[in-house]
């Protein structure tokens, strides 16, 4: 006597789809796009406090998921780009105002000023003394300054930012 058992048609395994969704979501967030909420007014009027931004993590290279730098780099930030990088274990959003090789000029007449192209940025005496010996942006670095430069802690305070430490470019706000 032969017994034939009918197999039930396979039902979709919901857990497979959930795990696949989580996996692909993590890959997208780590390597492709990230949504961040900006804290602070240093980038006003371009980006306001508590505003959400979308960062393309592939703009300059592939991010090292276990560090604060790019693993493989194919492009450098250029002046005008709004970039995201780490400073003291915090993500920072600033505008690249000069890239490697760009000339920097300083003035101490009636206050301290940094001249980059057509733009002038105020400096404190301490910032002036820290920066005045750099006639240009060093190779592999950028000068990153907040658009609201009167209320920004940026490259004028902590120095140039290494291109390899830039994690992405703001593409939408």
Which residues are covered by each model-predicted region?
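Protein maturation boundaries and topogenic segments
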Residues: 1-91, 159-173
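Short beta-strand-centered aromatic/proline hotspots
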Residues: 93-100
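Short polybasic amphipathic segments
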Residues: 110-117
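Structural motif
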Residues: 50-51, 81-82, 102, 141, ...
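Short, solvent-exposed secondary-structure boundary/capping segments
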Residues: 104-110
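Acidic/glycine-rich C-terminal interaction modules and beta/coil loop segments
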Residues: 39-48, 118, 123, 127-172
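Residue-level detection of beta-strand-connecting loop/turn positions
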Residues: 89, 117-118
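Solvent-exposed loop/turn segments at secondary-structure junctions
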Residues: 60-61, 89-90, 103-104, 149-151
